[in-house]
């Protein structure tokens, strides 16, 4: 008989930095999931990624207190900020307060295309051109200029 799925949790955790402190500990602990087991597995899976980049993760937990999880690619906004040279870290730079009027940086179409290749699996796009348009739209919505 298959394990009974009780639910799922969606979190964004910095790559390689999962630990039992909030938000990870309380989110998993109140559902009876082994926190340290998850933290070790997540950190092992994300050790090849750049440390500190937020990674979306979907955790499915079952009636027998076991779990599975899927890591996704970093958010497009993080990749765009890095490509534009905006500050990431404790107090990251935000996008423009008035997108379309004020610009906070520039990204080239080649950078947008590279980000689209990375995000292709998570985007609702059939080909690279459609994914590139989605990422370019996100860049413009953040107040980044997309240049050739």
Curated annotation (Swiss-Prot):
Modification(s) after translation: One or more lysine residues are methylated.
RNA-binding as UniProt keyword: yes
GO molecular function: large ribosomal subunit rRNA binding; structural constituent of ribosome
GO CC, any one term: cytosolic large ribosomal subunit
One annotated GO biological process: translation
InterPro entries, per database record: Ribosomal_uL11, Ribosomal_uL11_bac-typ, Ribosomal_uL11_C, Ribosomal_uL11_C_sf, Ribosomal_uL11_N, Ribosomal_uL11_N_sf
UniProt keyword list: Methylation, Ribonucleoprotein, Ribosomal protein, RNA-binding, rRNA-binding
Classification via PANTHER family: 60S RIBOSOMAL PROTEIN L12, LARGE RIBOSOMAL SUBUNIT PROTEIN UL11M
Family: Belongs to the universal ribosomal protein uL11 family.
Biological role: Forms part of the ribosomal stalk which helps the ribosome interact with GTP-bound translation factors.
Oligomer and partners: Part of the ribosomal stalk of the 50S ribosomal subunit. Interacts with L10 and the large rRNA to form the base of the stalk. L10 forms an elongated spine to which L12 dimers bind in a sequential fashion forming a multimeric L10(L12)X complex.
Protein name: Large ribosomal subunit protein uL11
Species: Hyphomonas neptunium (strain ATCC 15444)
């Amino acid at each position: 008989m298959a394990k009974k799925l009780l639910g799922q949790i969606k979190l964004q955790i910095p790559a390689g930095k999962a630990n039992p402190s909030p938000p990870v500990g309380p989110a998993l602990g109140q559902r009876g999931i082994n926190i340290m087991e998850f933290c070790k597995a997540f950190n092992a899976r994300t050790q090849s990624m750049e440390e500190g980049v937020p990674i979306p993760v979907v955790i499915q937990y079952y009636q027998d207190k076991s779990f599975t999880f899927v890591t996704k690619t970093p958010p497009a906004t993080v990749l765009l900020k890095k490509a534009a040279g905006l500050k990431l870290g404790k107090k990251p730079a935000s996008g423009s307060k008035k997108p379309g009027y004020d610009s906070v940086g520039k990204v080239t179409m080649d950078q947008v295309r590279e980000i689209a290749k990375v995000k292709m699996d998570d985007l609702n796009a059939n080909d690279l051109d459609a994914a590139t348009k989605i990422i370019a739209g996100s860049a413009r919505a953040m107040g980044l200029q997309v240049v050739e």
